[in-house]
Amino acid sequence: MILANEVCDALATKLFKKIDNKIFELGVDLNLSLVPLSPDPELLKIIKNIESRLGPLPNHYQSEICLVLKPWLTYLNNFLDQGCILLIDYGYTEKDYYAPQRSSGTLLSYEQHKAYDNPFINIGQRDITAHVNFSHLAEIGVDLGLDLLGYCSQMMFLAACKIDQLEKTYPGK
């Protein structure tokens, strides 16, 4: 068994933005400002697939895609002759991840359990995270020949494991 708790959301992501109905990758300049760049071909391919399933993303829509999920999951899969990979993380299905109201993406930074939307403050002192597109992760696993047993959000997983009963079972601990 391979268990990864809150690993996927910490993997590097590519930011993108739709400007004048064109997709741009967002980079960072020396002034710590986001600047539009020509998109990575793999990024563009994934976005086109998302738009073919969900419809066009609105103009000025910004989000992120984790291109390293596939090589990372491939690496994990290569360790298994048999067994399972259990990934626990924060995220959404593709439909919810790229919903029109989530037009600024999910990229956040955390410091002392507080969330911030600007990752350029206290660089090196904050954890940077982006939620996981569970649909994309599941698709990668199936493409690798893994059997998908199911997926749910971390909140639903913990609720199903009766996390709320821990305090009652072990008061004061």
Where are each of the predicted segments found?
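A mobile, often basic/glycine-rich helix-loop segment
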Residues: 3-48, 100-110
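Long, Lys/Arg- and hydrophobic-enriched amphipathic alpha-helices
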Residues: 48-173
